[in-house]
């Protein structure tokens, strides 16, 4: 066996086991976001403005045109300032508007401010109101023409077809059981197909047969109509019939009916196929695909030259079919089974370059063009420049974005031909029929909605305002546009709060594809087929990375090499094969899913010699959805890389090929939840993707130019560039991410060091020398240990705690605002009533905690007082008021305190106040933000995981001296349960452990790329080289007794992650706290400082034991007997006996409810005396739980539900019982 070869990944050298020659580097991983947004700025905005202009008033006197747009100046604040100030990172958008008055010929031009437009940051995110957000790309059904088949009750095949636009009315073809053909307009009313054809001008049987051929189904429909015995003009009758169906109850007339049909399908304002819809429609309805391989039933003649292209009875080849289409022949007769003749009708489109003799590339028309319009243009002039000019002017007629009558006839012909096997039905889950709407397009649609609303306002104002004094500024109201944009960024389900636990989470979030959202599917209606892996996903969407839970398969991830083409379809790259020589070339082609289906594609790992020739004679290839074996000369393409089928997070799993897919899914998802640790360490066993993932995620600082490091400090690097300029790089120190993890950058260059462009000069969170480093390499042993690793629990050594191996920093943000209340303004102050000096020793003179102070739960962070309500003053108080002025007015303490179970060290304080000119929400005078950092060591109850879906909860931390140790005395760090491996079939973890053991001994870092990594013999060889046992097992000694264990144990180095599900965030206890308003029962949940629900089943358990008194107090004084719980509290404080419980509040609620249903309910005691139900005790008597008031306030601010909304809480949520990862991936956060 050959030794692995050294490969340089950034600054790190790894020994790579990869054998496949990489022709193409990984593309820039955030391209889908950046490119799409750039398209929107360059073209998308212009398209929308062009669509809407000109806006005319009803008399067509005034014209308002949008001429051009530009961004005026840089953003007001930097990205960092926006986050601190809760501002939006945006630039002002200005639009040049021209107002033309046709009567006077007067023209007014103005630049109109169209609001602040959010701008994408360098890393593909948006900052909206201070929060970093990501716009997820949406995967939706592409507009186009689709046909489907189903089997009816009699076992016959029935076909249906649909033309789906980007926006506008659908047109659906249906067959009923008696083979009558009908059309459904706009998903509502059915009319006969022949009625529609008549309305389109084929007004009698002869015309219909001439156009579509004689078909029994058409005859049957026509006969049925003939039986109705209509008189008059058939076209008008058809139009009126359609109008009656679509607008029942309105008096029909021909003019209205005509307009309605025009508006529905032929008017660009109401019907839009978009570029992609036109492309798909032409592709589907073009003639050549349907006549290819059929037998011609007549001589096919090129009308322009008189040349016979195909003789009658010949099979039409692919070449001939394409020539027929380009010759402008739109109807061809072919033989179908039993020598029947069928007429195939196309949609009259041709390639432009076959008709003009100049280069058409500069016209920017890639689609097929509509022949009648082209002929019209070519017949008017022979001058090349005039033709070009006319083509540019009539581009929307040549490539119409709405339907043409020819489209409808071609679709009808396709629909009729399906019965004879002409054409094929579509698979809607195929990626050739689903397209990606990325940021740019989603924004464009939103902008279009805003402009459409603005257009209505402008039209109204045009009629109202005085024509002479009107200017563009007075007509335009930008509110609808800014509101539409704000609404999209703020509340669209596709605009997500960025997942920022670690760099990988952020990167994946930006490369995500969602089938949910407006215009997409909904979770409940999505069936199994949509969610399933499809053969067309290969190299485009990852088959592994998707959430577990209700969103499985609906939210997916972009594959590593995939890219989105101009129509929004996903493409993936392949290497071309020279078929003559059976040699793989380095030429790369990108193919969409439907193009790929016609090629035979070999695997990237297919063995080739030095020159790239296939070694094997027979080669396994993919062909459509099948996997077949062919001769080596038949192979068309070869995969570009073995990792092209998976996403970035999946390609980070070494030995993925040895893991079960379900576990690999968990592994991919859990890597995104790894907490950035205090010190980072890249994996010994990597896959070679770590470097690109870290660099492209944008958390590392890269050098902009070649130069020499002049100065390095913790928070800035100065580089003197070779071209004489100087660059200063500012590093972010201890910033809080969206999820409360710590974002910290640190320099990895020295003074005087030479740096190259694009070199990593500073590491971010979870990176190590520019490589992604989510966890730590630790020594693991697979063996049971005293039952402490039962059910996937993990036993760890105290060394991991002492040496801060798995210590992470978490930063919480607390905010306090001083508002204006009805009784006067709140005040942030050190002077708090009834608080001892001890409690405010760490506050500065303003009443704000000093940086560096250590705080624990209940400590004051910001002192704040709120005016109390006025009461009747006594004479003495009035006297004091008169002497001392207002100061003696009552205030109460509403300071911001550290919540329960929190604490740490204050690392930052930000103060914003209206007096300093900061922008604050209305009614807020001052805003203080305090950042508190905690160092969290790993502890019992934390969740850890490897990269192979092997997760577990820490059950015990053992002293180092008790851990099992190796023969040389090294204690292991972690003991895992061997039973977690066989049934789960993630053998990758074992191979990683073995290879890690050898690599550690040899001092290597290893890269073992997915599907192209180290084999079993490679690992054995590495173990031999390191002088270790080739089976990877070692004798272990018990740390407590020093005796060896009976059997040899698998020991080695594994990369283990600490996940964000930390026990400190989950553990919770309450004695007294807030109660629900209506039922007076304690709230539930940690966020509400709630209690544990004692549910129905728990009550049964106590009943079974007959524990009557325990049950009674649980249901009364510990829950909702208001008077009883106050008295009980007093009794405990005074040391007396606990009194008799009273009547629970919820019982009173029940009685009231029955009374509200007009039932007179009375309570009687044993001796038939009526028991008075006392109303609930007054507000003053009600005990306020620990700071319940602030918590109530906080709930309202955090948008938690109010107390009075009855809630049902789950039973005690144990720290180990995860709300599993599916929730984290939920699309509407």
UniProtKB/Swiss-Prot annotation:
<dbReference type="Pfam" id="PF04563">
    <property type="entry name" value="RNA_pol_Rpb2_1"/>
</dbReference>
<comment type="similarity">
    <text>Belongs to the RNA polymerase beta chain family.</text>
</comment>
<feature type="compositionally biased region" description="Acidic residues">
    <location>
        <begin position="1195"/>
        <end position="1204"/>
    </location>
</feature>
<keyword id="KW-0548">Nucleotidyltransferase</keyword>
<protein>
    <recommendedName>
        <fullName>DNA-directed RNA polymerase subunit beta</fullName>
        <ecNumber>2.7.7.6</ecNumber>
    </recommendedName>
</protein>
<feature type="compositionally biased region" description="Acidic residues">
    <location>
        <begin position="1211"/>
        <end position="1229"/>
    </location>
</feature>
<dbReference type="Pfam" id="PF10385">
    <property type="entry name" value="RNA_pol_Rpb2_45"/>
</dbReference>
<feature type="region of interest" description="Disordered">
    <location>
        <begin position="1175"/>
        <end position="1229"/>
    </location>
</feature>
<dbReference type="GO" id="GO:0000428">
    <property type="term" value="C:DNA-directed RNA polymerase complex"/>
</dbReference>
<comment type="subunit">
    <text>The RNAP catalytic core consists of 2 alpha, 1 beta, 1 beta' and 1 omega subunit. When a sigma factor is associated with the core the holoenzyme is formed, which can initiate transcription.</text>
</comment>
<dbReference type="InterPro" id="IPR014724">
    <property type="entry name" value="RNA_pol_RPB2_OB-fold"/>
</dbReference>
<keyword id="KW-0240">DNA-directed RNA polymerase</keyword>
<dbReference type="Pfam" id="PF00562">
    <property type="entry name" value="RNA_pol_Rpb2_6"/>
</dbReference>
<dbReference type="Pfam" id="PF04561">
    <property type="entry name" value="RNA_pol_Rpb2_2"/>
</dbReference>
<dbReference type="Pfam" id="PF04560">
    <property type="entry name" value="RNA_pol_Rpb2_7"/>
</dbReference>
<dbReference type="GO" id="GO:0032549">
    <property type="term" value="F:ribonucleoside binding"/>
</dbReference>
<dbReference type="InterPro" id="IPR007120">
    <property type="entry name" value="DNA-dir_RNAP_su2_dom"/>
</dbReference>
<dbReference type="InterPro" id="IPR015712">
    <property type="entry name" value="DNA-dir_RNA_pol_su2"/>
</dbReference>
<dbReference type="InterPro" id="IPR007642">
    <property type="entry name" value="RNA_pol_Rpb2_2"/>
</dbReference>
<dbReference type="InterPro" id="IPR007645">
    <property type="entry name" value="RNA_pol_Rpb2_3"/>
</dbReference>
<dbReference type="InterPro" id="IPR007644">
    <property type="entry name" value="RNA_pol_bsu_protrusion"/>
</dbReference>
<dbReference type="GO" id="GO:0006351">
    <property type="term" value="P:DNA-templated transcription"/>
</dbReference>
<dbReference type="InterPro" id="IPR010243">
    <property type="entry name" value="RNA_pol_bsu_bac"/>
</dbReference>
<dbReference type="InterPro" id="IPR037033">
    <property type="entry name" value="DNA-dir_RNAP_su2_hyb_sf"/>
</dbReference>
<dbReference type="Pfam" id="PF04565">
    <property type="entry name" value="RNA_pol_Rpb2_3"/>
</dbReference>
<keyword id="KW-0804">Transcription</keyword>
<keyword id="KW-0808">Transferase</keyword>
<dbReference type="InterPro" id="IPR037034">
    <property type="entry name" value="RNA_pol_Rpb2_2_sf"/>
</dbReference>
<dbReference type="InterPro" id="IPR007121">
    <property type="entry name" value="RNA_pol_bsu_CS"/>
</dbReference>
<dbReference type="GO" id="GO:0003677">
    <property type="term" value="F:DNA binding"/>
</dbReference>
<dbReference type="InterPro" id="IPR019462">
    <property type="entry name" value="DNA-dir_RNA_pol_bsu_external_1"/>
</dbReference>
<comment type="function">
    <text>DNA-dependent RNA polymerase catalyzes the transcription of DNA into RNA using the four ribonucleoside triphosphates as substrates.</text>
</comment>
<dbReference type="InterPro" id="IPR007641">
    <property type="entry name" value="RNA_pol_Rpb2_7"/>
</dbReference>
<dbReference type="GO" id="GO:0003899">
    <property type="term" value="F:DNA-directed RNA polymerase activity"/>
</dbReference>
<dbReference type="InterPro" id="IPR042107">
    <property type="entry name" value="DNA-dir_RNA_pol_bsu_ext_1_sf"/>
</dbReference>
């Amino acid at each position: 066996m050959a030794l692995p070869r050294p490969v340089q990944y950034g600054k790190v050298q790894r020994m790579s086991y990869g054998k496949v020659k990489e022709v193409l580097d990984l593309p820039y991983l955030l391209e889908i976001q950046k490119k799409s947004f750039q398209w929107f700025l360059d073209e998308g905005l212009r398209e929308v403005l062009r669509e809407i202009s000109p806006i005319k008033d009803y008399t067509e006197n005034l014209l308002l045109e949008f001429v051009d747009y530009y961004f005026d100046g840089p953003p007001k604040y930097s990205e960092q300032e926006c986050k601190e100030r809760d501002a939006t990172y945006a630039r002002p958008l200005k639009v040049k508007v021209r107002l033309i008055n046709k009567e006077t010929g007067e023209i007014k031009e103005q630049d109109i401010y169209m609001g602040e437009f959010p701008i994408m940051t360098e890393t593909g995110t948006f900052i909206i109101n201070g929060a970093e957000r990501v716009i997820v790309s949406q995967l939706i059904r592409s507009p186009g023409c689709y046909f489907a088949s189903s089997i009816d009750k009699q076992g016959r095949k029935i076909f249906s077809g649909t033309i789906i636009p980007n926006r506008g009315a659908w047109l659906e073809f249906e067959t009923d059981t008696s083979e009558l053909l009908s059309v459904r307009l706009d998903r509502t009313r059915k009319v006969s197909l022949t009625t529609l054809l008549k309305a389109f001008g084929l007004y009698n049987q002869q015309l219909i047969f001439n156009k579509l051929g004689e078909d029994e189904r058409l005859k049957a429909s026509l006969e049925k109509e003939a039986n109705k015995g209509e008189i008059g003009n058939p076209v008008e009758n058809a139009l009126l019939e359609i109008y009656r169906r679509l607008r029942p109850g309105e008096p029909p007339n021909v003019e209205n009916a005509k307009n309605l049909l025009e508006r529905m399908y032929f008017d660009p304002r109401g019907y839009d196929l978009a570029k992609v819809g036109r492309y798909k429609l032409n592709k589907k309805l073009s003639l050549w695909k349907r006549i290819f391989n059929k037998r011609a039933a007549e001589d096919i003649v090129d009308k322009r030259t008189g040349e016979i292209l195909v003789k009658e009875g010949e099979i039409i080849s692919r070449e001939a079919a394409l020539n027929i289409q380009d010759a402008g022949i739109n109807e061809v007769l072919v033989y179908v089974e039993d020598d029947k003749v069928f007429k195939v009708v196309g949609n009259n489109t041709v390639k432009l370059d076959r008709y003009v003799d100049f280069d058409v590339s500069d016209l920017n028309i890639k689609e097929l063009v509509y022949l009648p319009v082209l002929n019209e243009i070519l017949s008017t002039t022979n001058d090349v420049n005039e033709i070009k000019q006319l083509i540019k002017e009539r581009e929307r007629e040549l490539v119409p974005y709405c339907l043409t009558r020819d489209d409808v006839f071609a679709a009808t012909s396709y629909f009729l031909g399906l019965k004879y096997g002409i054409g094929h039905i579509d698979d809607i889950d195929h990626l050739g029929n689903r397209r990606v709407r990325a940021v740019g397009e989603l924004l464009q649609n939103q902008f279009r909605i805003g402009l459409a609303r603005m257009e209505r306002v402008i039209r109204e104002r045009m009629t109202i305002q005085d024509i002479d004094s009107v200017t563009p500024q007075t007509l335009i109201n930008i509110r609808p546009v800014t509101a539409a944009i704000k609404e999209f960024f703020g509340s669209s389900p596709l605009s997500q709060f960025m997942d920022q636990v670690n760099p990988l989470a952020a990167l994946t979030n930006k490369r995500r594809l969602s089938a949910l959202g407006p215009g997409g599917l909904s979770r409940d209606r999505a069936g199994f087929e949509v969610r399933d892996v499809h053969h067309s996903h290969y190299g485009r969407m990852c088959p592994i990375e998707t959430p577990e839970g209700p969103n499985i398969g609906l939210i997916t991830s972009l594959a590593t090499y995939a890219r989105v083409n101009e129509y929004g379809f996903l493409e993936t790259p392949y290497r071309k094969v020279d078929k003559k020589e059976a040699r793989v070339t380095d030429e790369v082609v990108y193919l969409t899913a439907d193009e790929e289906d016609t090629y035979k594609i070999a695997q990237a790992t297919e063995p080739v010699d030095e020159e790239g020739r296939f070694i094997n004679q027979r080669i396994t290839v993919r062909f459509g959805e099948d996997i077949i074996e062919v001769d080596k000369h038949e192979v068309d393409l070869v995969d570009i890389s073995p990792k092209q089928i998976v996403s970035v997070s999946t390609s980070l799993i070494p030995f993925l090929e040895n893991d079960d897919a379900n576990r690999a899914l968990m592994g991919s998802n859990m890597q995104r939840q790894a907490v950035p640790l205090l010190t980072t360490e890249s994996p010994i066993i990597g896959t070679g993707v770590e470097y690109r993932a870290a660099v492209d995620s944008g958390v590392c600082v890269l050098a902009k130019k070649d130069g020499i490091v002049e100065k390095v400090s913790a928070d800035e690097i100065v580089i003197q560039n070779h071209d004489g300029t100087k660059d200063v790089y500012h590093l972010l120190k201890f910033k809080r991410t969206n999820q409360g993890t710590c974002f910290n950058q640190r320099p990895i260059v020295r003074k005087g060091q030479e740096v190259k462009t694009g070199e990593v000069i500073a590491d971010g969170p979870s990176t190590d020398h520019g490589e992604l480093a989510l966890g730590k390499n630790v020594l693991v042993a697979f063996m049971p240990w005293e039952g402490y690793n039962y059910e996937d629990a993990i036993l760890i050594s105290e060394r991991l705690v002492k040496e801060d191996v798995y210590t992470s920093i978490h930063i919480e943000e607390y905010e306090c605002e001083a508002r204006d209340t009805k009784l006067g303004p709140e005040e942030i102050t050190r002077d708090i009533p009834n608080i001892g000096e001890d409690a405010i020793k760490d506050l500065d003179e303003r009443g704000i905690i000093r940086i560096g102070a250590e705080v624990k739960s209940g400590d004051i962070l910001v002192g704040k007082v709120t005016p109390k309500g006025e009461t009747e003053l006594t004479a003495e108080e009035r006297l004091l008021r008169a002497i001392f002025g207002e100061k003696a007015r009552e205030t109460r303490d509403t300071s911001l305190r550290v919540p329960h179970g929190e604490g740490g060290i204050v690392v930052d304080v930000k103060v914003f106040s209206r007096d300093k000119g900061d922008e604050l929400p209305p009614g807020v005078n001052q805003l203080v933000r305090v950042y508190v950092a905690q160092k969290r060591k790993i502890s019992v109850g934390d969740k850890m995981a490897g990269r192979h879906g092997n997760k577990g909860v820490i059950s015990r931390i053992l002293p180092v001296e008790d851990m099992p140790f190796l023969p040389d005395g090294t204690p292991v760090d972690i003991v895992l349960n061997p039973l977690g491996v066989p049934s789960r079939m993630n053998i990758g973890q074992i191979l990683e452990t073995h290879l890690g053991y050898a690599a550690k001994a040899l001092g290597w870092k290893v890269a073992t790329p997915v599907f192209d990594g180290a084999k079993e013999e490679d690992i054995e060889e590495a173990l031999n080289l390191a002088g270790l046992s080739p089976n990877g097992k070692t004798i272990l000694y018990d740390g407590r007794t020093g005796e060896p264990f009976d059997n040899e144990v698998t020991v080695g180095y594994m990369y283990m992650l600490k996940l964000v599900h930390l026990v400190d965030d989950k553990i919770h206890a309450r004695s007294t706290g807030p109660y629900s308003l209506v039922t007076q029962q304690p709230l539930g949940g940690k966020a509400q400082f709630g209690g544990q629900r004692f549910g129905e089943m728990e009550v049964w358990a106590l009943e079974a034991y007959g524990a009557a008194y325990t049950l009674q107090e649980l249901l009364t004084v510990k829950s909702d007997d208001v008077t009883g719980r106050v008295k009980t509290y007093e009794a405990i404080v005074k040391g007396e006996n606990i009194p008799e419980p009273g009547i629970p509040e919820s019982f009173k609620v029940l009685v009231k409810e029955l009374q509200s249903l007009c039932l007179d309910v009375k309570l009687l005691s044993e001796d038939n005396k009526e028991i008075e139900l006392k109303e609930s005790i007054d507000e003053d008597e009600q005990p306020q739980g620990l700071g319940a008031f602030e918590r109530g306030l906080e709930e309202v601010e955090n948008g938690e539900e109010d107390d009075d909304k009855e809630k049902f809480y789950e039973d005690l949520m144990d720290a180990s019982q995860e709300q599993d990862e599916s929730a984290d991936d939920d699309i509407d956060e």
